[in-house]
Amino acid sequence: MTMARNWRDIRADAVAQGRVDLQRAAVAREEMRDAVLAHRLAEIRKALGHARQADVAALMGVSQARVSKLESGDLSHTELGTLQAYVAALGGHLRIVAEFGENTVELTA
């Protein structure tokens, strides 16, 4: 009779055998997170009545392609000023929170 194995053991075996690359998995998780966040930004843009990326781009002073890139998940490579301009164009305010253990500092942009 085969005993059920827990996920931790299966994962450890896969890593040891080279079937799973933890670094690639971490990068994939970050890319997925960025894509989900970017999609949420696009949904908010549309919900606020800005149907076209070109309209937001004009408010920001950038190209429509730049807004498209931002909304396609390129958040980790987006400059803070660009993200701030995007949020401001939608009528929002960007907040950044730095955490150091139990200490936090809120930075406003």
UniProtKB/Swiss-Prot annotation:
Keywords: DNA-binding, Toxin-antitoxin system, Transcription, Transcription regulation. Residues 53-72 bind DNA. The gene is higA3. Putative antitoxin component of a type II toxin-antitoxin (TA) system. Its cognate toxin would be HigB3. Signal peptide: none annotated. Pfam families: HTH_3. GO terms for molecular function: DNA binding. It comes from Mycobacterium tuberculosis (strain ATCC 25618 / H37Rv). This is Putative antitoxin HigA3. InterPro entries: Cro/C1-type_HTH, Lambda_DNA-bd_dom_sf. CDD domains: HTH_XRE. The lineage of its organism: Bacteria, Bacillati, Actinomycetota, Actinomycetes, Mycobacteriales. Residues 41-97 form the HTH cro/C1-type domain.
